[in-house]
């Protein structure tokens, strides 16, 4: 079966102002397009396609790159080769997809990947045979078909658990990045952790018409960071788990700060801020990860093997991967701790 792109009108603005005005005019019936390596395959599968596409490929304001700011339109190949940005960010970019895809795919596109699920990322005919799903055209989640509501087990027509599979999001969150959004209502800046919110459908705090324009990085002097990825293959595949860490050590080897972030585990990236400065909201249920529950006190302690294992055990205990991407949740849950231990050991030196 050949999957063809549906008909849509392509718009090519050359400035943010022009793009935002187009969005205002088109209302609800459009998508922004950057590299198109995720959006267009979804369109071919009939997944939430719109009648208009606004290409941001010719907006020069989105392509700047410096040690403290990266434009959303910077392609992943340029990130991979850059000597200006933290080496861990360049490495994470190099782990995405393939060299050919990285020539087109962008930072903004990777951070705003649509969530993925066995029951969603299929052809229209496959999904129609099953009866569709909550994320597209249906009214029930097939991954978790029953959910507790008001003390009763009811059909899950409320919560989508599709997985957010960005490689760059967990690392940038671990580094404490912020993002800038420009839209019809003006410009605003959010912590990257605040940008991600909700379930597998409503996964961004993004107002209609807003454009994700850039990521800003705090000073990384003295900050050690890294990223590890689990995937079925070393090329092409989305992560089924990503673990990032950023830490600061004093001269005595004691932890001054530690942030661990998980990707491809939940509907949004999960942050473990062991300093307690930035706490991810309690999900209020047992479906999603609560990184703060039982978090050990580790700041001010020497980062020895025992402390590293304690941190890794906490990540393993609390991680809640779902059965909706390749590899079993139990294995991915265990590997979350294994990767955390390996990363912290490497970063300790």
Question: What is each PLM-predicted segment?
Answer:
Residues 1-349:
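C-terminal structural segment of proteins
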């Amino acid at each position: 079966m050949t999957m063809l792109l549906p008909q849509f009108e392509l718009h090519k603005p050359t400035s943010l102002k022009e793009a935002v005005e187009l969005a205002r005019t088109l209302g609800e019936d459009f998508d922004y397009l950057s590299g198109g390596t995720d959006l267009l395959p979804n369109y071919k599968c009939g997944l939430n396609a719109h009648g208009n596409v606004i290409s941001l490929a010719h907006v020069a304001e989105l392509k700047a790159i410096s040690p403290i700011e990266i434009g959303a339109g910077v392609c992943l190949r340029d990130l991979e080769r850059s000597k200006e940005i933290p080496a861990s960010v360049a490495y994470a970019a190099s782990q995405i997809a393939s060299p050919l895809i990285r020539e087109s795919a962008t930072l903004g596109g990777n951070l705003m990947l649509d969530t993925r699920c066995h029951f969603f990322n299929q052809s229209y005919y496959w999904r129609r045979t099953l009866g569709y799903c909550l994320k597209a055209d249906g009214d029930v989640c097939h991954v978790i078909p029953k959910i507790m509501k008001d003390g009763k087990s009811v059909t899950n027509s409320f919560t989508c658990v599709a997985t957010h599979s960005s490689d760059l999001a967990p690392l940038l969150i671990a580094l404490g990045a912020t993002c800038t959004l420009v839209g019809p209502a003006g410009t605003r800046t959010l912590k990257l952790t605040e940008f991600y919110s909700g379930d597998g459908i409503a996964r961004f705090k993004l107002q209609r018409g807003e454009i994700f324009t850039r990521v800003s990085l705090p000073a990384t002097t003295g900050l050690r960071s890294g990223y590890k990825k689990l995937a079925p293959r070393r090329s092409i595949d989305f992560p089924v788990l990503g673990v990032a860490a950023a830490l600061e050590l004093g001269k005595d080897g004691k932890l001054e700060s530690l942030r661990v972030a998980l990707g491809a585990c939940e509907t949004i990236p999960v942050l473990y801020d062991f300093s307690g400065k930035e706490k991810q909201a309690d999900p209020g249920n047992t479906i999603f990860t609560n990184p703060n529950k039982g978090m050990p006190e580790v700041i001010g302690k020497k980062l020895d093997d025992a402390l590293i294992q304690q941190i890794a055990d906490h990540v393993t205990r609390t991680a809640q991967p779902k059965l909706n991407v390749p590899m079993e949740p139990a294995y991915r849950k265990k590997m979350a701790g294994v990767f955390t231990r390996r990363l912290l050991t490497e970063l300790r030196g």
